[in-house]
A protein has these predicted regions:
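The feature captures the beta-strand-to-loop junction immediately N-terminal to the Walker
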Residues: 33-35
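Helix-to-loop junction immediately C-terminal to a conserved catalytic motif
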Residues: 48
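Conserved ABC transporter NBD signature motif
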Residues: 56-64, 73, 113
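ABC ATPase NBD coupling module
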Residues: 64-78, 102-107
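ABC ATPase nucleotide-binding domain signature
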Residues: 81-85, 90
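Short coil-to-helix segment of the ABC ATPase nucleotide-binding domain corresponding to the Q-loop/switch region
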Residues: 90-97
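Conserved ABC ATPase "signature" region
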Residues: 97, 101, 108-126
Length: 126
């Protein structure tokens, strides 16, 4: 579960997020939609601590992310960016397996994850 409690973030004199509150339950897929400059990217960067909030608390599974190691936190969070973030010289399956391999999962577990992800988007037969 990801939770934002009274989160505010400003850049110089512009407040981008003001008193933001929301909860994303485990297993929930979320899409942030809005015009340029409304805070979508800022929100995502706050979740993985590429940015720090000016105030408020962001927690994952009840733990304040400020208390977590940034690198370890990022290893367990994934999101899809607007621009293409794939390796063009790799297959879809190879792209999917990048993170599990970085986490040092064995080949069997990597293959299982790849198949689960392909099935999720109805591409398991490709």
């Amino acid at each position: 579960m990801i939770q934002f409690e009274h989160v505010t973030k400003s850049y110089e004199k512009a407040t981008i997020l003001k008193d933001l509150n929301f909860t994303i339950p485990d297993g929930q897929f979320v899409i942030l939609i809005g015009p340029s400059g409304c805070g979508k990217t800022t929100t995502m960067k706050l979740i993985n601590r590429l940015l720090e909030p000016d105030s408020g608390i962001i927690s994952i599974n009840g733990q304040d992310i400020r208390l977590q190691d940034k690198v370890e936190l990022r290893r367990h969070i994934g999101y899809v960016i607007q621009q293409i973030g794939l390796f063009p010289n790799m297959t879809v399956a190879q792209n999917i397996s990048v993170v599990p391999k970085l986490l040092k999962y064995d080949k069997t577990r990597c293959a299982k994850i790849v198949q689960e992800m392909l099935k999720l988007v109805h591409m398991e037969d490709y």
